[in-house]
């Protein structure tokens, strides 16, 4: 069974609460972070909170004009030595998750309620 957690954390403070909750509630082998965010959010602050949890990172964007471009997001993650994937859509991110995650991994989808909603709706 692949575990999945979705959360609409969209600033550093809510990302810190999310990080604490993940650490206290879930047990997993690896955490795969699916991250997409609006370009007007505190991206650096969110990344600083969530990056320590992640083993693999999938950067994506919601179908929303305010969404940050995934290749732009990569600069916040790139120097940290994590495996990073870039997808053009949330649907593509979900396909990738299903390919790379195993039964002991936790998939965390966060950064934007738009991303969370699209992830939940993809291929229902």
Give, region by region, the residue ranges found by the protein language model.
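Nucleotide phosphate-binding/pyrophosphate-handling subdomain across enzymes
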Residues: 1-56
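C-terminal helical cap/extension that packs against the catalytic core
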Residues: 47-106
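Active-site-adjacent alpha-helix immediately C-terminal to a catalytic or transition-state-stabilizing loop
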Residues: 117-124
